[in-house]
Amino acid sequence: MLRSRLIRSSRLFSTSSQVRADFTHIVIGAGAVGLAIGAEISKDPNHSVLVIEKNEEHGQETSSRNSEVIHAGLYYPVDSLKTELCILGKQLIYNECEAMGVEMKRCGKWIVAQNELQLEYLKKIHEKSKQLQVETSFVPSNKAKELEPSIRADYAVLNSPTTGIVSAHSLMNYQLSVLQNNDGQLAVGSEVVGLTYSEGMKEYEVDVSSEDGENMSISGNVLINCAGLYAPQVSNMLLPEERHLKAYYAKGNYFSFQGNPGIRRLIYPCPTPGVASLGTHLTLDLGGQMKFGPDLEWVDELTEDVYKVNDQNLIPAYNEVRKYFPSVQLENLSGSYSGIRPKLIGEDVKEFQDFVIRKEDGYPGFINCMGIESPGLTASMGIAKYVSNLL
């Protein structure tokens, strides 16, 4: 387990109620985005960087409980941060991380249409991809049947060759190595319990508590909130009540598939307009094992058993998968794992919600990164560049 020097040294102060350490930059949250930001800003030798993580290891929540897809950047409004930073992040992953040994594969993706309405949707995505200069192409039906005989696509197949898969842990471990090679630190098992801003000192004080009851007060000139599911909660510790945000949680269950029909690429159904997910899709891991998900299940709170797969969702997922993979058998599917999407809007709100990455008025040096759901893993290095430019 990777632990920072801060955590190890703080345990030496067993008789003291507080330990104080100063950094130029403090990042809250050691998921894919927090580690990427920590790595990026640590490249400046004038920066002393600390990344704080409440769990005992980095990347234990949304960053590792997802489809592990390198997204092309096709689905979101052209002028959105999701589109801009997904495309940039994809390029950085392929250009930088692949050369450094991060485990990944450029397997490509098909989006399949089963009716006229879905065909029109694919045409719009294809036109948008031209505007974004992201490669897509329609696959002739005879060629599609030759390449993937198990897949049903009654009306059309849109190919996205720049889509891939990546080991989230391999990617995060690479970012952590960059951070630590630049003398940055990761503090695990350290939950943020309070935030204050000193106008006179022009610095932030971060109150941190460990599982064994040890407390620390850490100061930093710049504070970056990348707490994922808990980002609104962290932001609300600092901002006045009228600027508080509510967190919403959209659970996604994944189901593993027993067998190997030889499918070689990711298969996505056409998304349903106004629904907060891309549909129950077919993804592959780096070993070629198939899985299906995520579905969409709204949960009210993050309970201890929130990550337990909801087996009641197996048959609905099976029915969705059958639409594009008709030979799938129910007995070949079983619950695998689940993840939680950090949402800033609830189930009843249908409009698009972009990433929220911004400076906060009245709090110089404080940057919020909230609502970082899909394509957050792909966009993580793009987000890091964006945040670095905000500083």
PLM region spans:
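Helical element adjacent to the flavin cofactor pocket in flavoenzyme catalytic cores
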Residues: 158-221, 381
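C-terminal catalytic lobe of FAD-dependent flavoproteins
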Residues: 308, 312-391
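Flavin-dependent oxidoreductases
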Residues: 36, 195-293, 297-308, 319
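Dinucleotide-binding Rossmann-like beta1-alpha1 core, especially the glycine-rich loop
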Residues: 68-143, 147, 154, 280
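Short beta-strand to alpha-helix junction loop
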Residues: 77-88, 112-121, 159-177, 187, ...
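N-terminal mitochondrial targeting presequence
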Residues: 1-22
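Glycine-rich FAD pyrophosphate-binding loop
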Residues: 42-65
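Beta1/beta-strand and adjacent pyrophosphate-binding region of the FAD-binding site
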Residues: 19-33, 50
